[in-house]
Design a protein with these regions (language model features):
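Central regulatory/effector-binding core of bacterial HTH transcription factors
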Residues: 38-98
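Immediate post-signal peptide segment of exported/extracytoplasmic ligand-binding proteins
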Residues: 34-41, 132
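Short amphipathic alpha-helical coupling segments at ligand-binding clamshell hinges
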Residues: 218-232
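A bilobed periplasmic-binding-protein/Venus flytrap-type ligand-binding module shared by bacterial periplasmic
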Residues: 209-221
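Short, surface-exposed acidic/glycine-rich loop or hinge patches that mediate macromolecular interfaces
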Residues: 8, 48, 216-217
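Alpha-helical "hinge/linker" immediately C-terminal to small N-terminal DNA-binding modules
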Residues: 2-30
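Short, well-ordered beta-strand segments
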Residues: 42-44, 89, 137, 182, ...
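C-terminal regulatory
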Residues: 83, 95-209, 235-244
Length: 244
């Protein structure tokens, strides 16, 4: 549909009204510049990044603004801005449609990992073909919410996937227990001395976190503040997200 001239003239007022309604729905007025940041901001994010990177950082933001609340929605699916499921969404796929503001938040690296004891008792992995002797841990294929997490077929189609889970944390714990090899985010697995990278040069992937919010949310001070804070986190954590 195309707006008429009258419609275009009314659009700013309509957007302002919608922003005010959103503010009331989140428990605070749309304009919080004088009273400080207040109300609720919902942030949708992938499980690993939300748990390990964002949650500790957001604690700082909520300490600075005691009247601000954050709902961190770390769920294994794509949240829909159009349905108001979140105010800000961090995803692995760039939104291609809708009236949204989108920015690149950060890249992050993933590698193939195995428990050191598991690797010691199983055949040596010197090249990709050696992976056929190993068990794997991965996602549940028919519940995968984005093609960006399809790694194993690119690496070496496994003969046996010993354990599947929609949760990256569950996959990580299974690998720690010796269930098999898995592609895990470096920011999750590199910190663990129990794990070691496998084929570190060949079995490496880089993905991108995209951050988006509805265009009308730019009128909300608290949403703008959380957006800017998350951008800062992405910049500050860049070396951790893509380590050497």
């Amino acid at each position: 549909h195309r707006l008429t001239e009258a419609g275009r003239q009314l659009l700013p007022a309509v957007e302002a009204m919608e922003a005010a309604v959103l503010g009331m729905e989140r428990g605070a007025p749309a304009n919080t510049a004088q009273s400080g940041l207040a109300g609720l901001v919902r942030v949708g994010v992938t499980e690993g990044f939300g748990t390990l990177v964002l949650a500790p950082q957001l604690a700082q933001l909520t300490r600075q603004h005691p009247r601000l609340s954050i709902d961190l929605l770390a769920v294994p699916r794509m949240l829909q801005l159009s349905r108001r499921e979140a105010d800000i969404v961090i995803s692995l796929e760039r939104p291609q449609r809708g009236s949204v503001i989108v920015t690149k938040l950060a890249d992050y690296a993933l590698h193939l990992y195995g428990q050191r004891e598991y690797l010691a008792r199983r055949p040596l992995v010197a090249e990709r073909e050696d992976l056929r002797h190993h068990d794997f841990v991965s996602y549940v294929d028919d519940l995968l919410f984005t093609k960006e997490l399809q790694f194993l077929d690119q690496l070496y189609p496994p003969e046996r996937v010993a354990l599947r889970s929609t949760s990256i944390t569950a996959q990580y714990e299974a690998v720690r227990a010796g269930a098999g090899l898995a592609v895990l985010p470096a920011f999750l697995a590199d910190r663990d001395p129990v794990l070691a990278r496998v084929l570190p040069r060949e079995a490496r992937f880089v993905r991108t976190f995209w951050m988006s919010m509805p265009a009308e949310a730019k009128h909300l001070a608290r949403t703008q503040a959380v957006w800017a804070f998350l951008k800062e986190v992405g910049h500050r954590e860049a070396a951790r997200l893509v380590p050497v």
